[in-house]
Regions:
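Residue-level detector of Asp-centered blade-edge/turn motifs that repeat once per structural unit
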Residues: 63-65, 114-116, 162-165, 233-236, ...
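Blade-level signature of beta-propeller repeat domains, shared across WD40, Kelch, NHL, RCC1
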Residues: 407-433
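Surface loop/turn motifs at the tips and blade-to-blade linkers of beta-strand repeat domains
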Residues: 50-54, 102-107, 145-152, 219-223, ...
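Hydrophobic core register within WD40 beta-propeller blades
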Residues: 60, 112, 160, 228-231, ...
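Asp-box/WD-like beta-propeller blade repeats and closely related beta-sheet repeat scaffolds
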Residues: 100, 109, 115, 125-163, ...
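Conserved beta-propeller blade signature
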Residues: 67-71, 118-121, 167-171, 238-242, ...
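Beta-propeller domain segments
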Residues: 21-41, 157, 174-216, 223-227, ...
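Acidic, glycine-anchored loop motifs typical of Ca2+
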Residues: 93-100, 136-137, 213
Length: 433
């Protein structure tokens, strides 16, 4: 049986689990959690604040000596004040909070990673790398690894992941919602073919060990993923990614989807298993929660049921509620958390803006159990209430904090970056073994 066919029933079965939750509890201030971060985590866990007010903190990398590096988004159109490429943090007195904070470079964006003595940094159109030393801050200017990466318009987040063999996988998000002739316009048809797929909405592969590479459509590794802001190499060496589903099914196609609840619940957000040549369907298809499969997009003649354009597209490995906006993806490799968390993946969700009024989803972190690269049950809410406002008031403008990047420290604690309040959380397990 082909991989594509074998995943179809799995994706359908997972749909029934997509709204699942587990019981969680608020951590109270105590001797094991002196600076409570006021988010919800499971019983036995402690969420504390490692650093605060850093600006638009995006993704994280942590060195073997516990130094923390966080990318700072500085590529937004209309950006006025100059921002650093990244911030370097050190806890010199070992009290659980950063006390040395250094701002380095200029014009950061999203991705950041440590590999083989280098710090790799996404700077929008380029990915650079700094040679690391024993000091917190690199002593020499960066070298260019890849240049010419598409940035504007549309999705600018440039997450990347480096495999053990040096392969550099780079997300290049779509420039628009669904490749319409007029983006996000009422009943505007889709461009057919969607020519932007040659340079956007996919994952590109380069070599992290080589300098001065140029972006090239021929380097595309996988396509049809609208915006894969989270990527990770699993324990099995496999590349995994998540991707954002499209928006505005009801708003742009009310004659096909007259019930506003349809656009509220569709399409699902997705976790993907990525191999060379994979096509995940965007913009021609979206994952219908109701049909439990990929269906034709309305821009390409779809009615919410047809699958004419989707038979050869690869379905997701797991699905999650619509418009939650998945960001980072992390396989837990530490020893601090209970053993069950070493068999699955953590995903941050930034929170929604286009669910129904009064029913937006705030930022959260989920845990998806996996075994041998396959889901073994429903996802669980691991950390919640980052927004810090009542549920009916949740929206991006009101949220106080929104989780983005994840990283595991040498002691097994989980670090989380927040790009609204500029906070870095540190989550540890202090419960019974």
């Amino acid at each position: 049986m082909s991989t594509l066919k074998s995943l179809l029933p799995l994706a359908a079965a997972l749909n029934a689990c997509a709204q699942a939750n587990v019981q969680s509890s608020r951590v109270t201030v105590g001797s094991s959690c002196a600076n409570d971060a006021a988010i919800i985590v499971p019983a036995g866990f402690c969420a504390s604040i490692f650093a605060d007010n850093l600006g638009r903190a995006r993704y994280l990398a942590i060195a073997p000596n516990n130094d923390v590096y966080v990318s700072i988004e500085g590529t937004r159109p209309g950006q006025q004040a100059p921002l650093p490429a990244f911030i370097a943090l050190r806890d010199t007195d070992h009290d659980g909070r950063a006390d040395r904070i250094e701002r380095v470079g200029s014009k950061g964006n999203t991705g950041i990673a440590l590999r083989d003595g280098f710090l790799y940094v996404d700077q929008g159109e380029v990915i650079t790398r700094y040679r690391m030393t024993a000091d917190l801050v690199p002593a020499s200017p960066p070298d260019t690894v890849v240049s010419g990466l598409p940035l504007n318009p549309g999705h600018r987040a440039r997450n990347f992941v480096i495999a053990p063999d040096g392969s550099l996988y780079v997300n290049v998000g779509s420039p628009d919602n669904s490749c319409q002739v007029k983006d996000r316009a009422l009943e505007s048809p889709g461009k057919d073919p969607c020519e932007e797929l040659s340079t956007r909405a996919g994952i590109w592969k380069f070599d992290a060990r080589k300098l001065n590479q140029k972006f090239d459509p021929a380097a595309r590794f996988a396509t049809g993923a609208r915006n894969s802001t989270g990527m990770a190499i699993g324990p099995d060496g496999q590349l995994y990614a998540n991707t954002h589903g499209r928006d505005q099914l009801t708003e742009n196609w009310p004659r096909i989807f007259p019930d506003s609840m349809y656009g509220h619940e569709n399409p699902a957000e997705s976790l993907l298993e990525v191999n060379r040549g994979d096509d995940f369907g965007w913009p021609y298809c979206f994952y219908s929660v109701a049909e439990k499969r990929l269906v034709d997009a309305p821009e390409y003649g779809g009615d919410g049921k047809k699958t004419t354009r989707c038979a050869d597209k690869k379905p997701p490995l797991a699905i999650f509620p619509a418009h939650w906006a998945p960001l980072d993806l992390l396989f837990y490799t530490g020893s601090n958390f209970p053993k069950r968390y070493r068999n699955g993946v953590f995903i941050t969700f930034h929170g929604s803006w286009n669910r129904m009024k009064g029913m937006q989803a705030g930022g959260k972190i989920i845990f998806q159990p996996l075994a041998n690269g396959r889901p073994t049950g429903p996802f669980e809410i691991f950390a919640d209430e980052f927004a810090g406002v009542p549920p009916a008031e949740i929206n991006p403008a009101r949220a106080k904090h929104r989780p983005v990047g994840l990283a595991v420290a040498p002691d097994g604690s989980l670090f989380v970056a927040d790009d609204d309040g500029g906070r870095i959380y540190r989550i540890t397990y202090t419960g019974k073994r």
